[in-house]
Amino acid sequence: MSLSNKLTLDKLDVKGKRVVMRVDFNVPMKNNQITNNQRIKAAVPSIKFCLDNGAKSVVLMSHLGRPDGVPMPDKYSLEPVAAELKSLLGKDVLFLKDCVGSEVENACANPAAGTVILLENLRFHVEEEGKGKDASGNKVKAEPAKIDAFRASLSKLGDVYVNDAFGTAHRAHSSMVGVNLPQKAGGFLMKKELNYFAKALESPERPFLAILGGAKVADKIQLINNMLDKVNEMIIGGGMAFTFLKVLNNMEIGTSLYDEEGAKIVKDLMAKAEKNGVKITLPVDFVTADKFDENAKTGQATVASGIPAGWMGLDCGTESSKKYAEAVARAKQIVWNGPVGVFEWEAFARGTKSLMDEVVKATSRGCITIIGGGDTATCCAKWNTEDKVSHVSTGGGASLELLEGKVLPGVDALSNV
């Protein structure tokens, strides 16, 4: 899925117009301080383009966290983002304390030329996602008439619409698909992300290696299935490897992650790999722990020895890392989605860190390396490798759905050309 048949910002006339732009400012925060501004920085080129080309105003809207339709300004306000954006743009940013309603509409109706406005968190309104929870935590659904009113109010804030929120492109939320303006264009970040994935999946360099980690097989079935039609090699690591190893090798896995549902289709996936000539690499040894805890006692195990009862595998061992390194060395293109161990904890980070080192090495010899967002992007931030790989996606769920071969609603909703 690419933007080849969709309107993009570089083809949009913004002169004298109010641009309402959906961005993804869902950034990690600690004590109201932004801990990683990657997503804010990523939106700057689109914002600057509008200002440089004479836009009357740029009105930015985003979500932050999961307030589930309840206003929680103490916990999920976008106000800290306004300050960060001001320093990145080098100009004032007007922060509004809501995203819809008459006060917001008035503030956005006729601003001074070149004004940048940031709206408060879209998800303080249940009409953004269509469902949420009330103040007591009970599930609620938004009323259709109120969803229409919410979308109509957002549509009044601009003359043209730009969507640069790749990280939310897989969500059919009001701000993604419900703004009713004659021209709806994809921003530069959206374009960059989609072009990267389109080229990787539609005309890959070969050998093409997928590295798939993470916990549950069931969550990754569609991903594995779709990638088996595209890649030459696949590393299956992380927690989901135990389900494969138990089914295929009858390995004793102790209390390691085991996915009952996913186990049912392991053999089908392996048969498909064989039919398509895809070489699969699974881990052969492990760093184990006596409990799921950062300070657990650690041990070693192999597929042959098995993991003893009461113990669990939380990282791959050095022999596995060697096998992974060999696969990486053969590749001319790599897509990596999901860590291969509990990288957040020092004792179980070595497998993912040594794999990252190999991927960085591969990049420097000309291999195309794409990191699907989410946890793997967090690894890049942790080890400062964001500029040492070809592309770090800003969207975990969105990149996953592209790799699964799905159509993204936020892209589908843009104007055709």
From Swiss-Prot:
Q: Which residues bind ATP?
A: A215, K220, G239, G313, E344, D375, T376
Q: Where is this region: Mitochondrial targeting region exposed following cis-trans isomerization by PIN1 and recognized by the TOM complex for mitochondrial translocation of the protein?
A: 38-43
Give the top-rank taxon of the lineage listed in the UniProt record for this protein: Eukaryota
The GO cellular component terms are:
cytosol; extracellular space; membrane raft; mitochondrial matrix
Q: Name one GO molecular function term.
A: metal ion binding
Q: Where along this sequence does the record place binding of CDP? A: G214, D219, G238, G338, V340, F343
Q: What is this protein called?
A: Phosphoglycerate kinase 1
Q: Which gene is the coding source of this polypeptide chain? A: Pgk1
